[in-house]
């Protein structure tokens, strides 16, 4: 997954940090590309943590009009939870295999479109590895379980 995400980042000419987290949001692997921001590892981890823990793509928290973290909605202020680790912006995606969230992938370093493209490359790599073995992997930007 990380190799696919970084390969896509190279194609896009952007320095990314990739975090793969388990279902509890704890990092299994963090890789910061040469030249990527030093803040990337923490931000990518926050995104992977949030996506795994809440079983949804992080950008859905603030997507109008019903994003739950928007002012006036039920989860407004949630980004201050978990000592500020709760990410409500683009770049975090749950890893869903056979309908179950098994982890999260977080990207930091590009703009939202670039982070999403790299994350989708990571998810597609997992799908390519697991689908021949009879497993299904959800590969899309807007994931909410």
Located regions from the model:
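Flexible, solvent-exposed loop/hinge segments and secondary-structure transition points
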Residues: 1-145
